[in-house]
């Protein structure tokens, strides 16, 4: 066995192990709610795992993803063989097609420099086209095939607002929670990246002039999350405290790296959607729930762009400062004409 074959087999085994563990685990973690008497996901986290694995391994993750979802579907859902095949196609085809198109448009390195390059294309194709493609294929499958009543609502049998929330759960999973799996999995696969992540994102928090600010910021975030996710009901605090979280994360853009901000934002959103008894107090309709999901998705996009804009401005500022220092050094020397 040559080295290339060995590396491919090694990557396949690692990707398969990740899928077999992370896909069922993410399905278990996925927050849910009741809309019009039917159970609906608020964020379908297996899509986040799929995206993270694709971004890590590329086309070599296709077979592990198919096997991981096949095993998960067999374990959780009782269907006929044809229904299993149709369900697997609906879950994965749109993602594979969108990633293939991105590779054609951006080249072989389309998975690199996240999130520094081609933000708009990645958000459009992976954050919106993939979820819409998954739901359109499921609606078409529900029209052509019969599925059990327990899952028929996911194939277009639910009300309009139910379907809207269902689509938003996929968009939210792609845009908010993908990095929540991407960074930890990358650190598990490559311990060197874990050291890099510590040095770039975590260590400066404790050994920096803004360490007091970060400590107070984390305490405030934890307090607000504890209040919103507490097991009690209060119409006074409910969702009215939610804007404070947006303000906190906006303030942190200039002091934390995007990798750490995205992890903290995903963890905060997951807690809010999972322990939502107080956070969603007074939300009695699918329309209100749809609005809340829209706000979370919109802020995730804004957070990405604001972080990117700040990072770019810092790069430009360092470039200008370096140019100024170089100009000052040259200004200390007499001109060649004067010397001659």
Roles of regions detected by a PLM:
Residues 157-172:
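Short aromatic-rich membrane-water interface segments that cap or initiate transmembrane helices
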Residues 193-198, 311-322:
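Cytosolic signal-transmission helices at domain junctions
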Residues 240-244, 266-272:
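Active/binding-pocket-proximal capping segment
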Residues 320-340:
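Conserved nucleotide-binding and Mg2+-coordinating catalytic segments in signaling enzymes
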């Amino acid at each position: 066995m040559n080295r290339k074959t060995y590396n491919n087999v090694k990557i396949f085994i690692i990707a398969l192990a990740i899928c077999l563990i992370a896909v069922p685990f993410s399905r278990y973690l996925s927050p849910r709610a009741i809309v019009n008497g039917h159970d609906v996901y608020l964020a379908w986290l297996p899509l986040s795992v799929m995206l993270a694995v694709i971004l890590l391994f590329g086309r070599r993750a296709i077979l592990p993803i198919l096997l991981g979802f096949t095993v998960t579907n067999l374990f959780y859902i009782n269907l006929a063989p044809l229904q299993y095949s149709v369900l697997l196609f609906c879950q994965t085809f749109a993602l594979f097609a969108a990633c293939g198109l991105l590779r054609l448009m951006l080249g072989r390195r389309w998975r690199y420099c996240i999130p520094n390059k081609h933000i708009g294309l990645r958000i459009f194709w992976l954050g919106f086209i993939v979820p819409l493609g998954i739901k359109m294929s499921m609606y078409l499958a529900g029209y052509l095939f019969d599925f059990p009543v327990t899952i028929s609502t996911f194939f277009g049998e639910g009300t309009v607002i139910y379907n809207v929330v269902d689509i938003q759960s996929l968009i939210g999973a792609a845009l908010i929670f993908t990095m929540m799996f991407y960074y930890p999995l990358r650190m598990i696969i490559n311990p060197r990246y874990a050291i890099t992540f510590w040095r770039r994102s975590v260590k400066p928090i404790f050994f920096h002039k803004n360490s007091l600010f970060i400590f107070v910021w984390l305490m405030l975030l934890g307090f607000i999350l504890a209040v919103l996710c507490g097991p009690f009901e209060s119409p006074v605090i409910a969702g009215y405290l939610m804007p404070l979280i947006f303000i906190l994360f906006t303030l942190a853009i200039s002091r934390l790296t995007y990798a750490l901000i995205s992890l903290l934002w995903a963890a905060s959103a997951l807690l809010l959607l999972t322990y939502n008894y107080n956070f969603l107090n007074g939300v009695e309709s699918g329309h209100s729930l749809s609005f809340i999901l829209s706000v979370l998705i919109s802020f995730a996009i804004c957070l990405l762009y604001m972080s990117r804009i700040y990072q770019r401005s810092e790069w430009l500022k360092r470039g200008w400062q370096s140019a100024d220092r170089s100009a000052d050094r040259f200004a200390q020397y007499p001109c060649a004409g004067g010397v001659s």
